[in-house]
Amino acid sequence: TGQIPKWDLSKVRGAGEPLKTFGGRASGPQPLDDLFHFASRIFQDSAGRKLKPIECHDIVCKIAEIVVVGGVRRSALISLSDLNDREMRFAKHGEWYKLNVQRALANNSVNYKERPDVGTYMREWLSLYDSKSGERGVYNGVSAKNQVALLNEREKDGNGGYVKRREPRDDFGTNPCSEIILRSREFCNLSECVVRRHDDVESLKKKVRSATILGTFQSTLTN
């Protein structure tokens, strides 16, 4: 019974207009208009009930699809889903790339919160194989918590104990490529170093150290 609000995109920079700061050309208002219509259809179809995980997933993927600057994609996603969520398991089965092309914007993985039995684990891997897309992948949430517990035993506090920098009881996730353990709403500090021909071990160490500091600092730049 809800109403869909109207929107005015007349002040959005027109398609093809130059971007002075980032370079490239503007995408124009059409992608944003497509997103609003896409989300509205899902909201209408789900009237009277909560959104399903797959519906939330599709909306977030559609948002990521339009987040571009100068024609360059500026988004990266991963969806961690429950073991018993069949719709997320089969999100990239069949001709999803024709019917739900926005799903290409996210990696999908099941999040194991406890060690599964062999049969359950093998069924998940068979589903991954049958999809021909390499997804849903597997993220071991239990292992992430165990790793955090080990990190808390690295730095002594001078009183016979250790400095507890992370709470091992937190529900940890990961960045879109699953290299980094993250808390809820925490930002990725992933950085990249360019190796030049003249680099040696010492110069590479310096680059990695600088990138680590910069990446950690940049991950805090949010309100």
Residue ranges and their predicted role:
Residues 2-8, 46-59, 67-79, 220-223:
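Flexible, glycine/charged-enriched surface loops at secondary-structure junctions
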Residues 1-21, 130-223:
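Function-dense linear segments that define catalytic or interfacial modules
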Residues 30, 34, 38, 54, ...:
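Generic recognition of stable, solvent-exposed alpha-helical segments in well-folded globular domains
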Residues 18-26, 55:
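Charged, amphipathic alpha-helical regulatory modules used
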Residues 30, 34-43, 62-161:
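Conserved, charged catalytic cores of large soluble enzymes
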Residues 23-31, 182:
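Short alpha-helix boundary/capping segments
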